[in-house]
Amino acid sequence: YSGIQNGCVVVPIDYLASRDDVSYILNDCKPDLLFTTSKQQDDVEAIFANLSHKPELVYLDKVEQNNSTREVKPWEEPSDVEKTAVIIYTSGTTGSPKGVMLSFKNLIANVRSVSKDVEIYTEDRQVLILLPLHHVFPLAGSLMAPLYVGGTIVISPSMQSTDLLDTLKKNRVAIMIGVPRLYEMIYKGLKAKIDASFVTRTIFA
């Protein structure tokens, strides 16, 4: 949001993508800034060695926290809604990843459509983000639409079943948007924990 507010084009990348795919994306879109964390430092350094265009690198966990408060500027609509706001790269299953350029108009139309036609988002509901935000579906349905109506988003520390359950306990989550494979992974994780104990296995059998 900070990037978009300042007129930047945002390119979310899957941190689990292969080094080759990340290198391809960076060489293709040629970003000026790359935000990551120290956890990915080894991969980033290996990728940077083969880049023709090297962006400025920012490790988010090394940025000094500024606790000072300042007035938040009200959101201003972009002067050119046709301007590219986000570039989403495909998974590259049929070749190299391809960048899909989405304008501000695309995003606004998507969010307004989802908010109006899928009447599940309200100000008092919390939405748990489960899917990665480098895909359009979770970007619009799990992040942008809830915030658009004044709702709350919740992010789990990881996809581990224990973290998910802990997140659900601590927050009043009303909506979880996912895909069948994701729910299957959650089910298998929970079932493995149930099967590991004779007591729980007896109770849930």
Question: What spans do the regions from the language model cover?
Answer:
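Conserved pre-ATP/AMP-binding loop-to-beta segment of ANL
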Residues: R70-Y89, S96, I120-Q126
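Structural core segment of the AMP-binding/adenylate-forming
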Residues: Q5-N67
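ANL superfamily adenylate-forming
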Residues: K39-V81, L190-A205
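Conserved AMP-binding/adenylation subdomain of ANL enzymes
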Residues: I108-Q126, L133-A205
